[in-house]
């Protein structure tokens, strides 16, 4: 079942203890991080950098970061269709190295700004451990498309942050080491991609240079195809390109103007992006529906006001239009005074764009992750709803035991997770039931502890103890 949700780990604002919020990929477009851990400082223009932001992880202490904000460099020209993709896969299989190689290879064609590995893996804690904790975002272009690329963490502690990145992808590049084959997080990321509704996957078999036997690489390819088919992706049809992200990156760093045909490993990167261009379709954006953006992060810019960042889920937004801020607190109204993406000013943000919106008269304390910005009157906050829920089996990574009425897990809805209580359980025939077994499909009535902007047909995930235990869709709003 495809679900859209984002994860939560730690909070930067003084949130109530029952609502948890986590770092966002789209905010990464907005603010350039510096490495001194000090009080937050923002300069006075409203803008967009392209590197990683802050660190927040399930098992780590969040440090204060200082942020600087860069002036917008001109206007964003919408010449090519925009697609959100990202790298997923097991820790140390080469996701961040591949992301760096992609930006450098396309920069050599004049289609992107090159990003070095340590610009993508920028948080000090990440570089110390050599792993990506936050979801980092870069932009690049092929001949046909403009891409926003999210580099997702692979380390088990940080799967929640990976969810945040995956929830906004139109397609993913699954990175698997040809030397090791699929590993535990490879499987978990494929499952999560399915759950959050990532529609298409292209595979990059990395570290080909470390595999002496061609047959071994073919076995790994077969194993990956079987794994994708197991999680209901078309395993037999998925494009699989093998190569070496590290050797291509080294070649590009030695000669940034390298041309196609001059290095076999760099050519593999171009081959991968051709597969992505061909295989991952341009998504149909819901531009005709009323505007809605789920807030992923909030910043204050001295002298200008408060910026909310996130991905436009549907509709369009222009400077001067009014929006409702809905969820968690009382609904209030504000005017959008600026719209930007990738350090460039936009006339209009469309569904699918990751943007920053400057809001008039709003303090940072008035607004937080998990709220939504929406066209006035189109969505309201609720605390009680009925939903059809599929409870994952033990083999799917779910619970090992049943749960009963009164069960209190976390409900992941768009960019928030909030504690909710299961107050009623009904079976397929609408008869009251006492318990729910892993693998059951049931109707539940859920009561949330804070109001959240939700609507009929909205998908959510249920998580408990660091794992996904169920997936559902709201059938009706009760209150």
From Swiss-Prot:
Annotated GTP binding sites: 89-96, 151-155, 206-209
Keywords of this entry: Chloroplast, Elongation factor, GTP-binding, Nucleotide-binding, Plastid, Protein biosynthesis, Transit peptide
Chief location bin: plastid
Domain tr-type G: 80-284
Localization, UniProt: Plastid, Chloroplast
Region (G1), start-end ranges: 89-96
Region (G2): 130-134
Region (G3): 151-154
GO cellular component: chloroplast; mitochondrion
Gene Ontology BP terms: mitochondrial translational elongation
Residue ranges, annotated region (G5): 244-246
Family to which the UniProt record says this protein belongs: Belongs to the TRAFAC class translation factor GTPase superfamily. Classic translation factor GTPase family. EF-Tu/EF-1A subfamily.
Protein name as catalogued: Elongation factor Tu, chloroplastic
Organism: Glycine max
